[in-house]
Amino acid sequence: ITAVSDVSPTQLKHIAETYRAKAYADPYMLVKAPDVDAVFICSPDQYHADYALAAIEAGKHVFVEKPVTLCIEDLEKLIAAEKAHPELVCMVGYMRRYSQGFLKCKELLASDDRKIEYMRFRDIILEGDFFMDQTRPPYLCSDISDEVKAESSSRRRDQITRALGNDCTDQQRTTYVMLTGLGCHTLAAVRELVGLPVEVESVFPQVMQSRTCHYCFPIQ
């Protein structure tokens, strides 16, 4: 780790000292640093597009957390930038697509001649001991200004509005956040296995305000 950047001064200082890395209050200065080869973007979703675009334009390889952007407009800009720099590796953090279990599943599906009639995916969220034991204790900070928080919330709301339209409801926003925050992992996995869906057949509510979607895929 060569350099780090964070919106919290105390968090930035702590991480820089822990990993003996340079500290940048301005992330755009970090991506321009000559000793930085690749950039990991782990910021809130609403900053992914700007940081990734800046990194690509600075000639850096990019790993950006999911969702890569919150609206199509920003995604198209990133795709154009990535295509203009074929020498760079740019990827989104869909780690499930690289797990041994998933790769084995993909191999088995490809080698089986039987037609797939139905696929069902579940997301299990558990910050259990297996994961927590591999991480350091949380380092909490309380020095992020109200102005920065307000700007972040405003930016996020604006990008979701651009994606859904001005007349979108709070319920639609919540559903969209669930899709981009968690559901995108499942969608990325099933797309890797069977390709792009051709239509959304139905959407209906279940318990605890959750939503279930039926997608139709062109499975042979």
PLM region descriptions:
Residues I1-R20:
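N-terminal Rossmann-like dinucleotide-binding module
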Residues H14, Y19-A81:
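Beta-loop-alpha module in the N-terminal Rossmann-like domain of NAD(P)-dependent dehydrogenases
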Residues A49, L53, E76, S99-L103, ...:
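A structural signal for well-ordered alpha-helical segments within the folded catalytic domains
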Residues T69-V148:
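A contiguous active-site-proximal alpha/beta segment in oxidoreductase catalytic domains
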